[in-house]
């Protein structure tokens, strides 16, 4: 017996939703500014974004500055929640590309390889306007916020007005 109730609408960005069809590239770029001022809070927020994007069928990478930062995020993703399993690995160089659905990269990601790019790095890749989706996560630390301002200006110079989710308010 078939259920005659209509299926609920798929989540935006999910595979079931198909291509977004959005012409406005600004809808794909977000800044997340956290109220907390710790690296741990930043990593936790990034892990939540990874989980959400991966659950929607995206291939996700997180761009980190250091191996220490990558290892911290790696540990967090393995222990994110008891019921979660996020298949991922660390890729230290472009010569050893990541084949997992989620990658923690120590080098700028190629836009064609990833659906969602999450930046924890101090440097925004030059081709940031080529990514399908881009999220930048900053915790409430003066140096990190200054980097975020630079990233925002860089995106504006590429013609992108990123959405800002300021959680300090």
Language-model regions, residue ranges each:
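Glycine-rich, aromatic-bearing surface loops/beta-hairpins
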Residues: 132-169
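N-terminal polybasic/positive-inside topogenic patches
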Residues: 13, 17-22
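Mid-chain, well-packed structural core segment of small domains
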Residues: 95-130
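Short acidic, S/G/P-rich loop/turn micro-motifs used as interaction or catalytic elements
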Residues: 37-39, 68-70, 110-112, 123-128, ...
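Short hydrophobic beta-strand segments
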Residues: 30-33, 59-65, 117-119, 136-137
């Amino acid at each position: 017996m078939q259920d005659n109730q209509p299926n609920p609408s798929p989540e935006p960005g999910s595979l079931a939703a198909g291509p977004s069809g959005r012409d406005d590239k600004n809808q794909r770029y977000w800044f997340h500014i956290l109220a907390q001022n710790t690296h741990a809070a930043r990593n936790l927020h990034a892990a939540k974004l990874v989980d959400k994007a991966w659950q929607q069928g995206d291939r996700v990478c997180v761009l980190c500055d250091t191996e220490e930062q990558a290892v911290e995020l790696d540990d967090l993703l393995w222990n994110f929640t008891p019921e979660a399993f996020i298949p991922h690995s660390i890729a230290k160089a472009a010569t050893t590309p990541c084949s997992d659905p989620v990658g923690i990269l120590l080098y700028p990601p190629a836009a064609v390889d990833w659906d969602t790019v999450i930046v924890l790095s101090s440097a925004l890749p030059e081709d940031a306007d080529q990514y399908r989706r881009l999220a930048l996560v900053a915790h409430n630390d003066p140096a990190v916020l200054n980097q975020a301002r630079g990233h925002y200006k860089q995106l504006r110079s590429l013609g992108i007005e990123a959405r800002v989710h300021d959680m300090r308010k």
